[in-house]
A protein has these predicted regions:
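Generic secretory/membrane-interface signal
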Residues: 5-8, 374, 500, 514
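A sequence-level/structural motif corresponding to short, flexible coil/turn segments enriched
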Residues: 12-489
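Sec-dependent, cleavable N-terminal signal peptides
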Residues: 1-13
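C-terminal outer-membrane/trafficking sorting elements
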Residues: 492-558
């Protein structure tokens, strides 16, 4: 059963506008094997590209894929919701990001282990990629390109290795080289990829140098460095370094300096990169130029600074937003979302220190969600807001951001409260930010695990993982809901009326008796009752529904 959703009421419309299409896609024999928050994209024509994991035979339109272990799929729906094709990576692989270009080509990147067969839409193996030797974890990187029909075009593996000189030192430590793709963006004839890595990475004659830390003179470990790379979009060749942030020295003896997150946005050839980093002696490299970055760092307290760079050809503008050093051992400082719109940059994520964009803003519980708006030309702050939501146990709960939608007057933020001990979702989160004020308010509390948009097209995803033993006995299903006009998606600020609708995952309950009607996302009536205070949906299929009570409406996910 899907996680119970929080109470929410609406009176914005008599009935929220129906989506263009919805679909449920079952891909795993056990729900626990689903890749949560699976990457998605929407192309310029409104076609939806979805990804995820599959452990059972996958039939999608004319495509048929057979899994090897927990495999990864990439599938395409057209604007009307018709299934077009599915391709895949048969083997231990996970797609972490996906993008499209102006011609409808599809690019996916992620992590894998051992040997993985790359399948096209016909199910034929077009290439086999091999990961780092003797590594069972998914620590090797890949990029794959398909055309708009699902035909294989090109692929690339990205492998890290421990530095030979460091590994030969007379010290004790376990080195764990890795490369993890984070975000893909196509701009013109270039494909851009942000990533984190440990160890040395060699690509097309370009080398990313691994960084290491030594403590007590004998114990050493990898440090995390993050970067943005570019490739020729046509064939994934000619790798080039756009930006890197990591420790200045290859081997530091005082402390561990890590880059903790990276995100980026592109507009008209100008690249905006944002990092989270901690360490006294860090170096930002952009357009071949080095800038020293220093954050407050002591043995018992660390600052997690937000470092931004605007790269326009060989011109680089930088800005560092500092916080206050804290002794938080559980660091939750992220840039989960980043977007450019009309001369402004919007960043969203979580933080558990004084907010670097405004040190007067603190957090509650384990962390808070934030949205910051910057002037793209100067990288100066326009405004910043935070959720001020106390999710409870500071050591075991966190606010996770899964999507951000930006328009001229409003920013919508969605996500969930997660138990960090077992990664279970405890409650959905939704926030609306009025960009004119600016002010943040709670929005519709509907579980959305992934979001993709392109212009007025918007695609939302959820799944049926609930973190209980049911995940071992229930098939894993992704649910999608697509709007061809995002302004009528219903993912907007909602207000309380004179009744309250509750949903516990099985039953709809009201504060007072009224007529209840339940619709599918496409508008068909599923169930109705008159003058009642509750209505059971225990026998309804998993999916997205709309509950209407008078002038109120509530989207639920079962």
């Amino acid at each position: 059963m899907m996680l119970a959703l929080a109470t929410v009421a609406a009176n914005a419309k008599d009935v929220l506008d129906a989506p263009t299409w919805t679909d449920n896609l079952t891909t795993t024999a056990e729900a626990k094997d689903l890749t949560r928050a699976a990457a998605m994209a929407v192309d310029n024509e409104g076609n939806s590209i979805v990804t995820g994991s599959f452990t059972k035979d996958l039939e999608f339109a004319a495509s048929y894929l057979e899994p090897v272990a927990n495999s990864a799929f990439i599938a395409k729906y057209d604007k009307a919701g018709a299934k077009k094709w599915a391709a895949g990576l048969a083997g231990a692989a996970t797609v972490t990001t996906v993008a499209t270009d102006a011609d409808g080509n599809v690019y996916a990147a992620g992590v894998f282990a051992d040997q993985v067969a790359i399948k096209d839409a016909s199910g034929e193996t077009k290439a086999t990629i091999t990961g780092m030797a003797d590594k069972v974890d998914k620590v090797s990187g890949f990029i794959v390109k398909y055309d708009k029909q699902g035909a294989y075009v090109a692929s690339k593996t990205i492998l890290a290795e421990s530095d030979a000189e460091i590994a030969a030192l007379d010290m004790i430590g376990v080195l764990s080289p890795s490369f993890t793709a984070k975000k893909l963006v196509v701009d013109g004839n270039k494909l851009y990829l942000s990533a984190s890595y440990k160890g040395n990475v060699a690509l097309d004659g370009v080398t990313l140098q691994g960084k290491y830390a030594c403590s007590e003179g004998w114990l050493y470990n990898d440090e995390t460095t993050m970067c943005v790379l570019s490739f020729d979009a046509a064939d994934l060749a000619n790798a080039s370094i756009v930006s890197v942030l990591g420790a200045t020295e290859q081997l530091t003896n005082e402390a561990t300096y890590n880059t903790e997150d990276v995100n980026f946005a592109i507009n008209d050839g100008k690249i905006y990169v944002a990092y989270v980093a901690s360490g006294k002696d860090m170096t930002l490299t952009a357009a071949g130029k080095d800038t020293k970055i220093e954050t407050a760092y002591e043995a018992s307290a660390t600052e997690h600074a937000y470092v931004l760079a605007a790269i326009d050809g060989d011109q680089v503008t930088t800005q560092v937003y500092h916080s206050v050093a804290t002794d938080n051992s559980n660091t939750l400082n992220t840039i989960d979302e980043m977007a450019y719109q009309k001369g402004k940059l919007y960043l969203a994520g979580s933080f558990n220190q004084a907010l670097p964009f405004d040190n007067t803003i603190s957090y509650l519980g384990g962390c808070d969600a934030y949205v910051a708006c910057l002037d793209a030309a100067s990288l100066n702050k326009n405004w910043a807001v935070a959720s001020a939501f106390d999710e409870g146990d500071a050591k075991h709960k966190a606010e996770i951001i899964s999507g951000m939608l930006v328009d001229e007057d409003e920013v919508t933020l969605v996500g969930w409260v997660e138990n960090t001990s077992d990664r279970t979702i405890e409650a959905p989160l939704g926030y609306q930010i009025n960009t004119k004020t600016p002010a943040i308010q709670k929005g519709e509390q509907v579980l959305i695990t992934s979001v993709a948009e392109n212009g007025n097209y918007a695609l939302y995803q959820t799944d049926n993982v609930n973190g209980s033993d049911e995940d071992k006995t229930t098939e894993g299903t992704y649910s999608y809901i697509f709007y061809s006009n995002a302004e009528s998606s219903g993912i907007s600020k909602v207000l309380a009326d004179d009744n309250t609708i509750d949903w516990d995952g099985n039953e709809v309950t009201l504060a007072k008796s009224a007529d209840i009607t339940v619709y599918t996302a496409a508008g068909a009536v599923v169930k109705s009752a008159k003058n009642v205070k509750s209505l059971s949906l225990a026998d309804a299929a998993h999916g997205i529904y709309l509950v209407k009570v008078g002038k109120q409406a509530l989207k639920i996910v079962k």
